[in-house]
């Protein structure tokens, strides 16, 4: 279990790339009311599905926007832009899966949640630009922002990531590394 105090999120890994032989990443996410609004992003090589366990799950998947209730399942195809948020006044609990499982998912969450525990996210829960591009260069097979366009990301991010690394930013920090326990 990892917590992000700045965003009001708690994440429990249920299945990882290692535990599933690369087949399935599964996690359970808890988001406090008013918690982080996940920015629009894509998964370039994974389908993602969500099952709402409790609360109101606000989402935008492609052009479709709505609020899902407990018991509903949503699927986001590979490469489709999507975002999510807690749309209610009670805690949101969702279960989600990515197929196939990538170790970069674990790196992404470990670093993002670790930065939050150190108070290094913006008030909106975003990662510093240079830190973000260093991380995204490492985990680009798992996640990419929906904007700017991919061609622009491909041109700018390597340059910005180099600058970020020169300033000491890393994609992964030993102090945030967690022994991943799955259930």
Mark where each language-model region is.
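Short acidic-glycine-tyrosine-enriched beta hairpin
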Residues: 19-22, 49, 62-81
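Short, charged/polar surface micro-motifs in flexible loops or helix N-caps
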Residues: 32-35, 56, 100-104
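Alpha-helical membrane-targeting segments
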Residues: 104, 108-183
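Glycine- and acidic-residue-biased ligand/ion/polar-headgroup-sensing regions
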Residues: 45-57
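Residue-level recognition of well-ordered beta-strand positions that form the cores
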Residues: 28-30, 56-58, 95-97
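Ligand-binding loop in jelly-roll beta-barrel domains
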Residues: 78-108
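A short glycine-rich, His/Asp/Glu-containing loop-to-beta-strand
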Residues: 3-40, 46
């Amino acid at each position: 279990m990892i917590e992000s105090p700045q965003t009001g999120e708690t994440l429990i890994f249920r299945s990882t790339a290692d535990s599933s032989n690369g087949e399935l990443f599964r996690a359970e996410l808890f988001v406090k009311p008013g918690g982080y609004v996940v920015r629009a992003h894509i998964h370039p090589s994974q389908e993602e599905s969500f099952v709402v366990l409790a609360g109101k799950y606000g989402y935008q998947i492609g052009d479709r926007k709505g609020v899902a209730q407990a018991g509903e399942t949503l699927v986001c195809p590979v490469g489709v832009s999507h975002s999510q948020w807690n749309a209610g006044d009670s805690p949101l609990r969702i279960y989600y899966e990515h197929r196939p499982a990538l170790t970069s998912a674990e790196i992404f969450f470990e670093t993002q949640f670790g930065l939050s525990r150190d108070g290094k996210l913006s008030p909106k829960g975003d990662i510093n630009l240079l830190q973000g591009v260093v991380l995204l260069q490492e985990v680009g097979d798992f996640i990419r922002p929906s904007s700017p366009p991919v061609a622009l990301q491909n041109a700018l991010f390597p340059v910005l990531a180099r600058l970020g690394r020169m300033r000491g930013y890393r994609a992964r920090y030993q102090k945030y590394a967690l022994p991943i326990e799955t259930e």
